[in-house]
Amino acid sequence: MAATEGTVVVKIGTSSLTDMQTGSLRLSVLGPLVEVLTRLRSQGYAVILVSSGAVGIGCARLGLRQRPTAIAEKQAVAAVGQGRLIRLYDDLFSALNQPIAQVLLTRGDFVERSRYVNANRTFTQLLQMGVIPIVNENDTVAVEELKFGDNDSLSALVASMVQAKWLILLTDVDRLYSADPHRDPSAEPIERVWRGMPLQIKAEAHGNSGWGTGGMATKLAAAQIATAAGVTVVITNGKRPDQIPAILAGEPIGTRFEPAPQPVSARKRWIAYGLIPEGSLTLDEGAVRAICEQGRSLLPAGITDVSGDFEAGAAVRLCDPGGREVGRGLVNYSAEELRRIKGKKTAEIPYILGYEGVDTAVHRDNLALLD
């Protein structure tokens, strides 16, 4: 049946999928999860599952007692585990007559615009066909500098790409806390978060399992990416996938991150979160106000420092005088050129560079602000 209720992206992590001691799969979690997602599909939702677990399952299959750290070994183990993982999903979903598809992505699929657009078209077609795509990072071929590092970021980028209505992050705690509830009995639960709301939490204290790569800090970063795209994000207990329908019905389960009232355009989301910055520009206070409060382009006169080695067209971080990142943009000049014209007036640029360049270092159409 056609999806009429919007798209739901569900991400389940290694800590929820596998036993922390042995790395073996928890069928007590997988079975109910498959049933819930199939039911949502029959109720008119388009569903995408982002599933970790390939490395953990590969470790269990090969008798490894801890996650490998060497890149080549980790990629080999992922290749072993991914086949077993998707086979199990196919067996479980097939029992309910629900077709699935395996979609393996790398960061390069988001960095290169043509691949990004093509991946989006593939997701759209699969969802129109009533298929549940099961997504994971392609660990076997991903190079270190183009890795997501965790599936929280991947799930947020997928949710943004397909303009999902919901992103459900299933984890090993029932909601976000001010500190790790496993270690700190005074940890306070946080039920709702709005964009721009200051969070007094020790994100790193939530940690992560020995088999996974994510922690609570990565989930907060994922929430920032997804909510900027207008996606509602919920962090909740991965051992209770049966609660997902209640969450979609509006019940206060887990921690809910409210979406931006005015979602950022697809192109600017791609600039802000899809691309990998190759350097950074430090701006003076006047330039920060101009781009953040007045929506203006960045002029060379407002740049005080240039870091990195990049060419024109590269993505860079835009930082305030204190080093806080306020945005990202595509530069009109190389790093070497920007070092020569930083702090200079526009009229001086042709004399410094020896040719007539553009007025802006980063045009506002190629500039995306961050919270």
From Swiss-Prot:
Binding site for ATP: 11, 171-172, 213-219
Function summary: Catalyzes the transfer of a phosphate group to glutamate to form L-glutamate 5-phosphate.
Annotated pathway: Amino-acid biosynthesis; L-proline biosynthesis; L-glutamate 5-semialdehyde from L-glutamate: step 1/2
Main location: cytoplasm
Domain PUA: start-end pairs: 278-356
Organism: Synechococcus sp. (strain JA-3-3Ab) (Cyanobacteria bacterium Yellowstone A-Prime)
A Pfam family per the record: PUA
BP term (GO), one: L-proline biosynthetic process
Any GO MF annotation of the entry: RNA binding
Protein name: Glutamate 5-kinase
UniProt key word ATP-binding: yes
E.C. number: 2.7.2.11
Source superkingdom: Bacteria
Matches recorded under CDD domains: AAK_G5K_ProB, PUA_G5K
Binding site for substrate: 52, 139, 151
